[in-house]
Amino acid sequence: MKIERPRGTRDFLPDEMERRREIEKRMRKIAESFGYREVATPTFEYLELFTRKSGEGIIEEMYVFKDKSGRDLALRPELTAPVMRMFVNECSVMPKPLRFYYFANCFRYERPQKGRYREFWQFGVELIGSESYLADAEVIILADKILKDVGVNFSLEIGHVGIMRHLLKPIGEDRASKVMRLIDKGDREGLESYLAEIRVNEDLRDKIFSLLELKGDESVIEEAKEIIDYDFGHLESLSALLRDVGVDFTLNLGIARGLDYYTGVVFECYAEGLGAQKQVCGGGSYELSSLFGGPVTPSTGFAIGFDRVCEACSVEAGEKSVVAVVSFKGLESQAFRVASMLRERGFTAVVDVMGRNLKKQMSFASEMGVKYAVILGPDEVKSGRVAIKNLETQEQVVVAEEELFSILQ
């Protein structure tokens, strides 16, 4: 009986892997051009790292297990917490800000559907040590540039969780956190019900829903000032800078985060054509270091859903020029020697390892889409020459071995 792959996982064949590597390469190059350096953390961590950040409820969505000593471990469901754990363990005394990026697989036990898998990849950055609007601007500009460079058609929405949190102060932290979770889920009915349950007065209720409706250009800040007495300077400065550098965005004061460690600016990117799973990037400012035993350290960052970007973007893998070195029986060592020379010059060269005759070697090369075949026969080997055949045009020339490289360029 065949063994199938686990539900919610995928196999990637060479064509798809080459495309994914091209997209990944572009993301890495852009992040590095902003001064970000790659970090990596373990595939599994102590379970407490994620429950301390997100609460016990997240366990239902995680792959959790005990090691042989009975310690509770989990496959990482995301990468911000591991990177911040690494910061507290290894980097907290380094000069700030720190600019890190990562690319890795994550695991969540969710119902598989289009755009949502149990094993998935994230590309993300963390800018650690600044609470300035300039830090928020940098990571938003970086996310915007990455998505544009790989050809995703998307919209960018920016909010600020501090505004709603300030409005909710009268109901206390625990109740405010539940309200934020309901807003984050988009559960308006549940929100209405909960506000009634905790007897929020009509004035505060109206202000909450009025704030949630504010979406548009910078004029929404002026409207928000009519609803709440709050210092909007950070958001105003950020908006002005982003406009100055040509980033297109919409302010959406209805964006929330259900997790208390988000502190200020938040943003989301939505791609066209992905249906319900259209969010391809999410980020914002947060403070996690102190939760993990480190110093209070303001940070900001984002994570890109790499699989969704692959589905939404227009990048194709670059064509590789593959050369097949084919030979008559008894000339295998010469074929391996010529192939090695080609590889040293930067070509991709393949030789027959099946013991096929010349005709079958040529047929296989054509089936594989190879453009050129370098043919070694007894006469060519004796005279230090090779035959080069263009398998697309069927043209063939015989040249001195040293001329081979210039013809294949």
UniProtKB/Swiss-Prot annotation:
It holds the Pfam family tRNA-synt_His. This is Histidine--tRNA ligase. Keywords: Aminoacyl-tRNA synthetase, ATP-binding, Cytoplasm, Ligase, Nucleotide-binding, Protein biosynthesis. It comes from Archaeoglobus fulgidus (strain ATCC 49558 / DSM 4304 / JCM 9628 / NBRC 100126 / VC-16). It catalyses: tRNA(His) + L-histidine + ATP = L-histidyl-tRNA(His) + AMP + diphosphate + H(+). It is an enzyme of class 6 (ligase). One of its GO terms (molecular function) is histidine-tRNA ligase activity. GO terms for cellular component: cytoplasm. Belongs to the class-II aminoacyl-tRNA synthetase family. One of its GO terms (biological process) is L-histidine biosynthetic process. SUPFAM superfamilies: Class II aaRS ABD-related, Class II aaRS and biotin synthetases. Its EC number is 6.1.1.21. It is found in: Cytoplasm. The gene is hisS. The keyword rRNA-binding does not apply. It comes from the Archaea.
